[in-house]
Amino acid sequence: MTPLRILISNDDGVFADGIRTLAAAAAAAGHQVTVVCPDQERSATGHGLTLQTPIRAERADELFEPGIKAWACSGTPADCMKLALFELLPEKPDLVLSGINHGPNLGTDVFCSGTVAAAMEGTLEGLPAMAVSSACFQWREFQAAAHLAIQVAEAALADQWPENLLLNLNVPPCKQEAMGKLSWTRLSIRRYDEQFSPRVDPRGRTYYWLAGEAVEDFESGGDGPRDWPTDVAQIQADAPSLTPIQPELFWRGGLSSLPQLNIDQ
């Protein structure tokens, strides 16, 4: 296909293996690649923006394959995408990719994900965008995920990519030859046993570390093909999950399902 202008970001930071592998795969496929990503770990920052301090961006070409332009930005993933689209890039890209995240972005976890937020910022600006995640924090072999991400993006662009559609790709932690077949999936609803670990600093003040373990995964009750598996079930079957997401979160269950508000005004 015609070479694409691809903008890549992430939330794991400029030194993460995932983003470097994805950028290298995109460049190897003949595309023009620009990276604008956080200068440090920014996981679980959601769609947060930096408003009270300045944002700095420094060139980081030396961390990537020759020919890839890169900036390391002091802000959040959403900051990086805004700065790239409205200041750093001379023209809008054809495609936005975010990742490869070092860990899954499944179900309702997408609301916390900086990886998904960076892609969503592209979607909000009317650009085709995809978030890519390796569904295991310990897995460090990103080549299969990068190859699949480029294949999916190229195929979608060659056919149709509806406006306001974000694609969320999660890839299981296994070799490509052991991987199941890619499938469209639905978002699951994830529930956590939130665990706060209290500590005391040298001045006697209490602080907390947040940890949590997913204890339940529910099928969403929203609209969509009911024969699609959930993204969590797909990954548990060692198969890649591709979930279409849209930024418009309006309730679609109908007026009869909403509470009756007998309020005097």
Curated annotation (Swiss-Prot):
It is an enzyme of class 3 (hydrolase). It is found in: Cytoplasm. Binds 1 divalent metal cation per subunit. Keywords: Cytoplasm, Hydrolase, Metal-binding, Nucleotide-binding. It comes from Synechococcus sp. (strain CC9311). Its main location: cytoplasm. A divalent metal cation binds at residues 11-12, 43, 101. One of its GO terms (cellular component) is cytoplasm. The lineage of its organism: Bacteria, Bacillati, Cyanobacteriota, Cyanophyceae, Synechococcales. SUPFAM superfamilies: SurE-like (SSF64167). It catalyses: a ribonucleoside 5'-phosphate + H2O = a ribonucleoside + phosphate. Its cofactor is a divalent metal cation. It comes from the Bacteria. PANTHER family: 5'-NUCLEOTIDASE SURE, 5'_3'-NUCLEOTIDASE SURE. This is 5'-nucleotidase SurE. Its EC number is 3.1.3.5. GO terms for molecular function: 3'-nucleotidase activity; 5'-nucleotidase activity; exopolyphosphatase activity; metal ion binding; nucleotide binding. InterPro entries: SurE (IPR030048), SurE-like_Pase/nucleotidase (IPR002828), SurE-like_sf (IPR036523). Belongs to the SurE nucleotidase family. Nucleotidase that shows phosphatase activity on nucleoside 5'-monophosphates.
